[in-house]
A protein has these predicted regions:
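A glycine-centered beta-loop-beta connector
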Residues: 31-34, 39-55, 96, 104-119
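The conserved cystathionine-beta-synthase
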Residues: 17-35, 41, 82-100, 107
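Short, charge-rich amphipathic segments
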Residues: 22-33, 65-75, 110-111
Length: 144
């Protein structure tokens, strides 16, 4: 059964992180620059939270906070749902759907080792389905 390790082999293990002292404005700029929807928040090499576009909308814009002076540590999601390298892709999809989240940090033996998104899960599933369709077409129609 395909697992998170398979996704990370395709996309890589780069993790974009910020410390709790980073301002919302700095985090938003980084997210925009890297074309990502969230950053993990780390302190002394430890995952302490996650900060996403949704947090910006709900906790900054909607509450009329100043992004230039508000640190992400005040607004980040502190209870972070994670997965492991061996978590099945199907289970990740279920977790993301039931928890209504789009980012899932991946924990390995030595701590944080990646982040997968709902888009990563969907892209992997689509690629697998396309491969299955190609195999079935080849079998049924003897296409080479």
């Amino acid at each position: 059964m395909p697992n998170v390790r398979d996704i990370l082999l395709r996309k890589g293990r780069e993790v974009i992180s910020v410390p709790t002292s980073t301002t919302v404005q700095e985090a938003a700029h980084l997210m925009n620059q890297r074309s990502i929807g969230g950053v993990v928040v780390m302190e002394t090499g430890r995952l302490v939270g996650i900060f996403t576009e949704r947090d910006i909308m709900r906790r900054v814009v909607a509450e009329e906070r100043d992004p230039a002076s508000t640190p992400v540590g005040e607004l980040m999601t502190r209870v972070v749902v994670t997965c492991t390298l061996d978590t099945s892709i199907e289970e990740c999809g279920s977790i993301m759907t039931s928890r209504r989240i789009r980012h899932l940090p991946v924990m390995g033996p030595d701590g944080l080792c990646g982040v997968i998104t709902s888009g990563d899960v969907l892209a992997f599933q689509v690629a697998e389905q396309q491969a299955t369709i190609a195999q079935l077409n080849s079998y049924v129609f003897d296409v080479r």
